[in-house]
Amino acid sequence: MITLTGHTLTIEEMKRLLLEGEGVTACPNSMQKVAECREVVEKIVEDGKVVYGITTGFGKFSDVLIQKDDVKALQHNLIQSHACGIGDPFPEEVSRGMLILRANTMLKGVSGVRPLVVNMLLEFVNRKIHPVVPQQGSLGASGDLAPLSHLALVLLGEGEVFYKGKRVHAMVALTEEGLEPIELEAKEGLALINGTQAMTAQGVLSYIEAEATSYQAELIASMTIEGLQGIIDAFDENVHKARGYKEQVEVASRIRDILHDSKLTTKQGELRVQDAYSLRCIPQVHGASWQVLNYVKEKLEIEMNAATDNPLIFDGGEKVISGGNFHGQPIAFAMDFLKVGMAELANISERRIERLVNPQLNDLPPFLSPEPGLQSGAMIMQYAAASLVSENKTLAHPASVDSIPSSANQEDHVSMGTIASRHAHQIIQNVRRVLSVEMICAMQAAEYRGIENMSTVTKSFYHQGRQQVPSITNDRIFSTDIENITHWLKTNYSIKERLDVNAAL
């Protein structure tokens, strides 16, 4: 059970919450702050003060005063009218993440909701009732209004949820779990939907997958180095310390650890003086992608614990301030950066695939074919990888450079952070598939070189891979092989924990 405080949630905890289904509880001190802040909101309503989002309309309607008797209706109308999401739903892990992050930000005690609302969010998490939230429709400011409105709907007993492996009406799940839908009161609708939790939840899942995929890329690249009898000197510690990037040094160190007892690597001048960049520069390129990941992790952990509501309530109600913490620009930039960093792992992987299949670049059978000419072998697998790499280049276009005005120009600059976050996740899926092609080719090359000559780590990795796909002895439908390896990487070597090279033993 992980305790939410509003201040301390980490990526490592999110891994346990999203991927292992661990439960959550609220810190009592944080809940006390929630209750105290709620008293301020109720006094504002009782006194008839004019405060945005509590006793006024929203967006362009911020100048419209709402009567006391209409405050509850205002919140309900807000949720229904803003539930304009479009398209396929977010993965269930993402909607679970939205619930967790929304509760966590409310526990900072500046949003003005009742403890009841926080408790309801936690009930949904712990009972694994996950909102069906369409992926499209958010501008990323004022936060993720449309996606979070779909999240808020289910608290009211409206909309749909994922529950026990099915997609059902929210009331079906609530009834089975013995829960009563809530009725929103002053400010609570706005507090539920004004934030960046859709882009951030998707970003967290993307980061977790990207981290594991990056470790996998090093293991697969190591197998390729063996298949091409690469020069191990290029990974010497002195070379990488001379440049000074710790991530580059760490990648080189892991590659050396993976290949320390390999009989397939060569020394400088033994077969050739130096290797092509796609082998020789693995630490420099992969290390740079790790720099991106470290940046993204830092920004995500800030946002996971951020108050992104509007208005925010401070000093016991002395200050009720309309600000712009809902603007998703920091996450938009981080997700665009993640897109570039991950796309580059696919770029260099595809070039290693080319070196494995091109007979002009190695002494292996052309396209790793068992009967070159009669059988095409891995020829079109390289095509498929090249296609994914090119698709990534389109997806990597920064969403954050775009903005379009909304709400009659009141909201005249937006982040497009949710688009960036969604595209980052798509890129990561493509990267995993490109790496799957590289792994298939590298395993085949290893067989020609002699499996007995592989390092202890890569040999174990090879045998596990061969449980997913057989050796290429005849042409077959290789699409199945690619998907089998992709699924295996994602579900077994995948996003549940950091890949330790020793885990392959």
Swiss-Prot record:
GO BP, one annotated term: L-histidine catabolic process to glutamate and formate
Example of a GO cellular component annotation carried by this entry: cytoplasm
One example GO MF annotation: histidine ammonia-lyase activity
Modified-residue entries (2,3-didehydroalanine (Ser)), positions: 142
Keywords, sorted A to Z: Cytoplasm, Histidine metabolism, Lyase
Keyword Cytoplasm: yes
Alphabetized PROSITE patterns for the sequence: PAL_HISTIDASE
Posttranslational mods: Contains an active site 4-methylidene-imidazol-5-one (MIO), which is formed autocatalytically by cyclization and dehydration of residues Ala-Ser-Gly.
The protein's annotated pathway: Amino-acid degradation; L-histidine degradation into L-glutamate; N-formimidoyl-L-glutamate from L-histidine: step 1/3
Name of this chain's protein: Histidine ammonia-lyase
